[in-house]
């Protein structure tokens, strides 16, 4: 994969995981909640992607999905699409609902490769099992990981180093997939009353390749205007703390990344703006539509027309 696409994918999709999982509110943990929201992604003032988030949950179960497509210059340089989903149930940690993921799936495609990963969780031990598949878009044939362009270009030393960086099984136990992790983080924020006082949280994550923690803090509610619309928001500032599975450069890059998410300070608690900064980019993602109110805003054709 082209280096630009890999950087865009790492930064933008990582941020979108947060939006996908944090969208619904649980002011009342027993209240069923559904959301369908559309977002636009901007980097350097350029429109580079669109996303649609779906989530449905009640006191027993949750299902969440995310579809993202490259737009504008990003689409011209390297077409990219991703489709992610997570589902599971809930247990309780004190008075806070804690997600228990059952299945996490991540599909993506670029100009050369189509890839799919499915991660499942043992309901008793919570041990994860992962299956991955790569297909060449040119030939339609399945590829091994060693045949992937970005792996083939690595030196023997780099491949040996990657093999040693595999996350040990015991480090995966008790972790959440990225989408379930942000659901857990949002529950902690709401349970601790972020509208009244600052809240801190830390959630363990395994994404199928890397093990890290999401660490966040909130600030007091304030009024902001975004695209001529005024919101009363709570700010959640996040950092990612690497634990296992990283190269030296990858660990440094993750430590340097900073995220900020603005949530409406109401019962829905939905994100209206996300910003992310690292050594490669500074990007922003804005809420463009509530698809339950404006369904056409979330169709691929309408998003493509808006991008042109």
Each PLM stretch: what is its role?
Residues 28-125, 178-308:
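Acidic, serine/threonine-rich low-complexity disordered tracts
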Residues 155-175:
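Surface-exposed beta-loop interaction hotspot
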Residues 100-157:
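Hydrophobic alpha-helical segments and helix pairs
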């Amino acid at each position: 994969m082209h280096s630009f696409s890999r950087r865009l994918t790492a930064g933008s999709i990582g941020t979108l995981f947060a939006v996908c999982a944090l969208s619904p509110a649980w002011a009342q943990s027993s209240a069923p909640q559904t959301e369908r929201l559309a977002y636009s992604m901007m980097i350097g003032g350029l429109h580079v992607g669109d996303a649609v988030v779906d989530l449905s949950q009640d006191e027993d179960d949750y299902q969440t999905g995310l579809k993202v497509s490259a737009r504008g210059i990003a689409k011209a340089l390297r077409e990219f699409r991703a489709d992610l989903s997570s589902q599971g149930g809930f247990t309780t940690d004190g008075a806070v609902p804690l997600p228990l993921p059952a299945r996490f799936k991540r599909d993506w495609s670029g100009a050369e490769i189509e890839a799919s990963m499915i991660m499942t969780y043992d309901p008793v031990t919570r041990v994860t099992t992962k299956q991955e598949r790569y297909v060449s878009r040119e030939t339609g044939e399945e590829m091994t990981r060693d045949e992937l362009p970005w792996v083939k270009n690595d030196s023997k030393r780099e491949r040996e180093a990657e093999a040693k960086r595999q996350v040990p099984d015991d480090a995966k136990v008790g972790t959440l997939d990225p989408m379930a992790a942000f659901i857990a983080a949002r529950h902690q924020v709401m349970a601790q009353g972020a509208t009244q006082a600052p809240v801190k949280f830390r959630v363990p994550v395994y994404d199928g390749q890397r093990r890290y923690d999401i660490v966040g803090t909130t600030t007091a509610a304030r009024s902001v205007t975004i695209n001529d619309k005024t919101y009363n928001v709570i700010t959640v500032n996040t950092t990612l703390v690497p634990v296992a599975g990283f190269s030296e450069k990858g660990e440094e890059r993750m430590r340097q990344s900073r995220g900020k998410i603005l949530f409406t300070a109401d019962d829905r608690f939905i994100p209206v703006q996300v910003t992310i900064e690292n050594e490669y980019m500074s990007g922003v993602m804005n809420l463009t539509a509530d698809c339950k109110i404006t369904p056409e805003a979330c169709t691929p054709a309408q998003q493509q027309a808006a991008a042109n």
